[in-house]
Regions:
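Glycine-centered small-residue motifs that form tight turns
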Residues: 28, 287-288, 321
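Residues at or immediately flanking beta-strands
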Residues: 85-87
């Protein structure tokens, strides 16, 4: 049996500039952090001659081509696993569609398990690149590369997306004090809304391809805020980082009609009035999680609890996609 896991993530600045429709022309940049909430994959050789795939539904098929789950099917093809004696199960700490990059985490965990099954050693950058081939190239999803790369490499990381497709990354240089304070003061609250990121990202993708000047200006500004966020983090100026998150969100929610709604805006304003310096909706927008940097955590938690929002406490993950068990 093989068990792998990949971390989910939160974006810290520059998100949205990792879509090919933007970075192929202008280059992209963002900062993201992996968190200790995971997608797990278990892979087990079975006695029965069939492929058993367990996720939100159950598939039992004879060949790879019959698999309905598109990522599973394409991952098996890419790695070259055609063995019909396999059972594959996925589990997650947080539901999909909540803005934490679960599809990228799922794909990297799955690929890691399949490579382990074939006794291949794969570097995190290669793992992320393969996940992008599956999701962006083979399946044509209108998404970016952030989720696959931060899941694979973990940590708090700055990514540069070059027009020629190269991705460079390096860990954010945080002092021990800054790391402690960032982890301690960032709070996540679930809005109760789930959504498919592809719906909102398709609008951004289409408008970027059409050189829509408003969309491009939004993304240029977002990239600038990403660079400024990195500078603030590395300088240990976390209050400035919080204000930049607020600037990012105020800017981001005008990017698309589905980015926010009156209820999310009400919760956000309530947070700023109760101990939060800044925050944002994590992911493409429209629901999922609100993340805030708080100077009064107790007050913010109380206010959000009274609004009916559930907090998910987290720590950062510095391991990325990994094998948990192999025997």
């Amino acid at each position: 049996m093989i068990i792998t896991r990949s971390p989910l993530r939160v974006s810290l600045g520059g998100g949205g500039t990792d879509l090919p429709s933007y970075y192929r022309e202008f280059g992209g940049f963002l900062v993201a952090a992996a968190i200790d909430k995971y997608v797990y994959i278990t892979l087990h050789r079975t006695f029965v001659q069939e492929l058993i795939i367990k996720y939100s539904k159950l598939e039992r098929v004879a060949t790879v081509d019959e698999i309905e789950h598109p990522i599973v099917r394409e991952a098996l093809r890419l790695v070259g696993v055609a063995n019909p004696h396999l059972e594959l199960t996925s589990m997650a700490d947080i539901p999909a569609g909540t803005g934490l990059g679960s599809s990228g985490s799922f794909t990297t965990a799955l690929l890691k398990a399949l490579h382990a099954y074939k006794r291949n050693i794969i570097h995190p950058a290669e793992l992320a690149a393969e996940a992008c081939v599956i999701e962006l190239d083979r399946l044509g999803e209108p998404i970016g590369k952030q989720d696959q790369y931060i899941a694979a490499v973990g940590g708090i990381t700055a990514f540069t997306f070059h027009p020629d497709g190269r991705v460079e990354y390096c860990p954010v240089r945080l002092s021990e004090e800054s790391l402690f304070n960032l982890e301690d003061n960032l709070l996540l609250f679930f809005t109760g809304y789930s959504r498919a990121a592809s719906t909102i990202l398709k609008d951004q993708n289409d408008r970027s391809k059409q050189n829509d000047p408003t969309m491009l200006e939004h993304l240029h500004r977002t990239k600038e805020l990403g660079h400024r966020s990195l500078d603030a983090l590395e300088a240990g100026n976390l209050e400035e980082f919080a204000h930049l998150m607020d600037m990012h969100w105020q800017h981001k929610k005008t990017r698309s009609d589905g980015m926010s709604n009156p209820q999310i805006n009400e919760w956000y304003d309530a947070a700023l009035a109760n101990g939060a310096l800044g925050g944002k909706v994590i992911g493409a927008g429209g629901g999922g999680f609100l993340m805030f940097y708080a100077i009064d955590k107790a007050r913010l938690r109380r206010a959000m609890r009274e609004k009916g929002l559930q907090e998910v406490r987290f720590r950062f993950d510095f391991e990325g996609t990994k094998i948990v068990t192999q025997n």
